[in-house]
Amino acid sequence: MDGTAESREGTQFGPYRLRRLVGRGGMGDVYEAEDTVRERIVALKLMSETLSSDPVFRTRMQREARTAGRLQEPHVVPIHDFGEIDGQLYVDMRLINGVDLAAMLRRQGPLAPPRAVAIVRQIGSALDAAHAAGATHRDVKPENILVSADDFAYLVDFGIASATTDEKLTQLGNTVGTLYYMAPERFSESHATYRADIYALTCVLYECLTGSPPYQGDQLSVMGAHINQAIPRPSTVRPGIPVAFDAVIARGMAKNPEDRYVTCGDLSAAAHAALATADQDRATDILRRSQVAKLPVPSTHPVSPGTRWPQPTPWAGGAPPWGPPSSPLPRSARQPWLWVGVAVAVVVALAGGLGIALAHPWRSSGPRTSAPPPPPPADAVELRVLNDGVFVGSSVAPTTIDIFNEPICPPCGSFIRSYASDIDTAVADKQLAVRYHLLNFLDDQSHSKNYSTRAVAASYCVAGQNDPKLYASFYSALFGSDFQPQENAASDRTDAELAHLAQTVGAEPTAISCIKSGADLGTAQTKATNASETLAGFNASGTPFVWDGSMVVNYQDPSWLARLIG
C-alpha cells in the first residue's frame, strides 16, 4: 500500500467491512469500517505493506499499541484492538467526527490566542498522562491532533510512540517524527526523553498562534535551525500576540531539554498566563464548552450508508471574537477526518471526572450551569472503598479477583505495566471485577521510610472521587517505570509528586489537596494492615499476588486473564 494505491472501499478485511477511506498517510490508510462481529462503526488503520512486513516495526507496533491501550485519558484516542490479518497489521480505534488541526489552520489561518491555548491545554493533558504511564508520543504535530466542532481536542497515532520502558528499536526509531516539530536531541546521539514531546507541543502552539511552524525550509535547513538557530518570537510574526508568549515559546523550545518545562501542564499554564486577562476568561470558556457539550452516544448497531453521526451541540454563549482580524489561508481540498467517537469520550469526561480540571490552574469566568448527568444504569461499573482496598467493577461481572501490590515492589510494577490495560478492558466490558489492595511492608526500604504508606494514602484520596476509571488509572500510574521508586534508592517521591501524578490522570483539586495534606495517612496505615491480613489469609506473604476467588492465579502465564474470563 502506498500513496497511489487504490481505495479498498466496499471490501472485506477480516471481520471489518471497509465503508469509506477517510485518511491516507505514509504509514497506511484509515477507513471508516463496520466491525461485523461487535456491531459497531470504527476507525480502522491498515498499515502499509512495507511496514507490515518489517519485523522491527511489527515489534514496535505490538508494544506501542499495548502502551496506548493503557492510557485512560479523554483526550487520547482509545484503541479497541490491534493485530494482523492476512499479513497486514491493523489498529482498530474509536471513531470521531472532527478535523485535524493542520487542516483547520490551512482553512482558517492562525487561531485566536485563547483558542490556541485551550487546544494545547487539552493535548498537554493527554501527553502528561502518557508520560506518567512511561510512554512518549514522538510525533506530536497538527496532523495528529483532531478537533471536534465544539473544540474538544484529541491526540492520535500513539501507535508509533516509543514506550520508555522498552528497549529501543533503533532501526526504525530514527525515522519516527516530523522535522518541523522535532527537538534538537532527536537529530543527535543524545537520548531523547519525554521532554521532546514538550518541545513538539510548543512548536504546535507557535504554529497555532502564527499560522506557520517555527522553522521553514528544506529538510537540512530545518534540522539545522532546530539545533542552532535562535528561537523565533511569535509577537514579532503576527501583530497582536502578547509579548509574554515569546518567553513561553523560548522555554518550551529550549535547545537543552533540561531547560524546558517539566510537564506539558506547566507549558499550558504558562501559555494561559501569557494571555491578556479577558482572553484568559475566553480560554476558560472554550475549555468549559468543550468539556460539557452534551451528545447522544452513537448506536452500536450497523449504520446504513450515508448515515451521519450526531454533531456536537453548540454552546450558546460563545466567546467574542479575538482581534486583530487576519485573512484566512486558502481553503484546502482535504476532507475532514471522521475519527474516534467524540460522544463517548465526552460522556466519559462528564460522568467520570476525567476531563480538564477547570478550577486549577485556570480561573473560571462564571458559574457552571450544565445540567447534572443522568444516574448510571444499575449494572454500571462502580467504585466502592473497602476496609482493605478498593472494589472496581459491575455487579453483573461473572468473576471477581483480588490483586495485591506494594508501591515499591519491582515485580509489582512489571505486573501492572504488563496487564493493566487488559484488566481495565475486561472491567469496562463487565467481564471482570477487581478488588485492588495496596500494602506498605517495604516502607523501611524507601528513602523517606514511609513512601509506601504515602502512596497508599494518595490512592485513597483519589478513590474519594468515586470514579472507577480514574482510580484504576492512578493505581496503574503509581507503577509507571518513570515514577515507581526502587528499593533502597537515594530518593523516592514526595507528596507534591504524588499529587502531580494524580493531577495528570485527571484528579480534582480536592483529591490533590488531600494528597498534599497527608490527611489519609492514618486511614492508609489501617487499610494496608488489613490488606496484609487478607493476603495472609490466602497463605501468601509476597506481592504481586492474584486470587480468583478459589485459587492462586499464575500470572506468569501470559494467557491467565484470557483463561479467567473465557
From Swiss-Prot:
Residue intervals of the Protein kinase domain: 16-275
Region span, Disordered: 296-330
Subcellular compartments: Cell membrane
Posttranslational modification: Autophosphorylated on serine and threonine residues. Dephosphorylated by PstP.
Gene (UniProt): pknE
Induction description: Induced by nitric oxide stress. Repressed under oxidative stress.
The reaction(s) this protein catalyses: L-seryl-[protein] + ATP = O-phospho-L-seryl-[protein] + ADP + H(+); L-threonyl-[protein] + ATP = O-phospho-L-threonyl-[protein] + ADP + H(+)
Species of provenance: Mycobacterium tuberculosis (strain ATCC 25618 / H37Rv)
Domain of life (superkingdom): Bacteria
Family: Belongs to the protein kinase superfamily. Ser/Thr protein kinase family.
Role this protein plays: Important for survival of the bacterium in the host during infection. Promotes the survival of infected macrophages by activating multiple signaling responses and suppressing apoptosis of macrophages during nitrate stress. May contribute to the adaptation of M.tuberculosis during stress conditions by maintaining the cellular integrity. Can phosphorylate the FHA domain of Rv1747.
Effect of residue 45 to M: Lack of kinase activity
Keywords attached to this entry: ATP-binding, Cell membrane, Kinase, Membrane, Nucleotide-binding, Phosphoprotein, Serine/threonine-protein kinase, Stress response, Transferase, Transmembrane, Transmembrane helix, Virulence
Enzymatic class: transferase
UniProt subunit comment: Homodimer.
CDD domains in alphabetical order: STKc_PknB_like
Active site: 139
Disruption phenotype: Mutants show increased resistance to nitric oxide donors, increased sensitivity to reducing agents, and growth reduction at pH 7.0 and in the presence of lysozyme. They increase macrophage apoptosis, and exhibit lower rates of survival and multiplication in an in vitro macrophage model of infection.
Pfam family, one: Pkinase
Name by which UniProt lists this protein: Serine/threonine-protein kinase PknE
